[in-house]
Amino acid sequence: MEDVMKVKVEEDGIPTAVLPMEGLHDVGPPPFLSKTYEMVEDSSTDQVISWSTTRNSFIVWDSHKFSTTLLPRFFKHSNFSSFIRQLNTYGFRKVDPDRWEFANEGFLGGQKHLLKTIKRRRNVGQSMNQQGSGACIEIGYYGMEEELERLKRDKNVLMTEIVKLRQQQQSTRNQIIAMGEKIETQERKQVQMMSFLAKIFSNPTFLQQYLDKQVHRKDKQRIEVGQKRRLTMTPSVTGSDQPMNYSSSLQESEAELASIEMLFSAAMDNESSSNVRPDSVVTANGTDMEPVADDIWEELLSEDLISGDRAAEEVVVVEQPEFDVEVEDLVVKTPEWGEELQDLVDQLGFL
């Protein structure tokens, strides 16, 4: 293409020097800026990319559609991050952190001639380091920090819930174990009690000796209580005699308990001569019955002592013949009580 020349003709008809047209050799804006300006100016693409209300910046409304439709048509690629990097090299800055809005002093709506003022920056990496992260455009990481924070919060909440559920599981497991132990203990006590009753009523001699000892012990306790009350009411009794009576009564009670325990242990040793089967004496878990029998024996003795003390308080004003009548009644009613328990033992299969 030949250069267009202007020829100035003077009045005398002699041409002067030829001058080139103004702006003929000026360099136009870079193709990237021109194509970007055309995309923003095109009203048919306003749903994807358009000017802001002030027309001093442009907004990418739909980055996905922008990458799949407009970038391939204008730039022969679909890499949105590459487009952002190109904007960064030409000095564009991100205006709104919540959306893809960019601005440049030379990129204004209706003023395309200002594109020539936009220059490509050199040493972009060095200038970015000097300006800091605030002046840089986010490239593919928009909203990532907020998303990471949200995920961290969700993780902490889930971890807290897991810890609570594990604590509840452990507590429930401990309760189940404790309940199982209680059930086993109750079952074991029932079996031991029935075995003990079967052993007692399989030996009538032991039962009779036990009743005789109980009657004798109650008799002594009532007499001692009556003596103590009479001694406290008598003024001639000195204070030194009372501790001796207490100590003697305690010694007699200890001797009484020792003799009863010896009698009970002797009866337990005669297990082979009784009519009870061997498996009825052993508990469900195969342990010996002597410790269990001792515990039951102590409970029976404590109940008898409590009932004996109450009876002794009532007997202070009662004459001796009435006491004999109570003993006879006790001896007479014993066979009936034994028959009822014997029937119970027979039904349970211990004899």
Curated annotation (Swiss-Prot):
Q: Which residues bind DNA?
A: 29-123
Q: Which GO terms describe its biological process?
A: cellular response to heat; regulation of transcription by RNA polymerase II
- UniProt-listed Pfam families: HSF_DNA-bind (PF00447)
Report the GO terms under cellular component.
nucleus
Q: Give GO terms: molecular function aspect only.
A: DNA-binding transcription factor activity; RNA polymerase II cis-regulatory region sequence-specific DNA binding
The main place the protein resides is nucleus
Localization, per the record, is: Nucleus
Among SMART domains, the record links this protein to: HSF
Q: Which UniProt keywords apply?
A: Activator, DNA-binding, Nucleus, Phosphoprotein, Stress response, Transcription, Transcription regulation
Q: Does the keyword Cell inner membrane apply?
A: no
Entry comment on modification after translation: Exhibits temperature-dependent phosphorylation.
Q: Which InterPro entries match?
A: HSF_DNA-bd, WH-like_DNA-bd_sf, WH_DNA-bd_sf
Describe the function of this protein.
DNA-binding protein that specifically binds heat shock promoter elements (HSE) and activates transcription.
- Assembly mode: Homotrimer.
- Tell me which family the UniProt entry assigns to this protein: Belongs to the HSF family.
Protein name in the entry: Heat shock factor protein HSF30
